[in-house]
């Protein structure tokens, strides 16, 4: 398993194949990810523990705020903007296509490109 440290927490890459990827994503309370989208990557996120707010682009192209709790699932389709803010320490389980470098950051608190 590969561990990838992030400014907001870390990712544990459990499986990466030519068909899919499985990651455990951990956010520290009060941190947030970049506002981002993916050109090709398609992901489903399951909230394993904690509470988070997700800014999420809906089917009409409008940004919504979703309150995510354990047991919730969110689908992030290619081209859809999204950002996670951890209200508590949060753990997601993410299943996606294997395009792990496919990240376009629109806004980023940590000045990453």
Model-found features: residue ranges?
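A generic "binding-loop/recognition-motif" signal
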Residues: 31, 40-41, 80, 88, ...
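Histidine-centered metal-chelating micro-motifs
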Residues: 32-34, 53, 72-83
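Short acidic-glycine-tyrosine-enriched beta hairpin
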Residues: 58-79
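Beta-strand residues in well-ordered beta-sheet regions across diverse protein folds
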Residues: 23, 35, 47-48, 55, ...
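Glycine- and acidic-residue-biased ligand/ion/polar-headgroup-sensing regions
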Residues: 40-58
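A short glycine-rich, His/Asp/Glu-containing loop-to-beta-strand
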Residues: 2-41
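Conserved hydrophobic/aromatic beta-strand scaffold that supports enzyme active sites
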Residues: 22-26, 44, 65, 73-75
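Double-stranded beta-helix
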Residues: 2-5, 62, 85-113
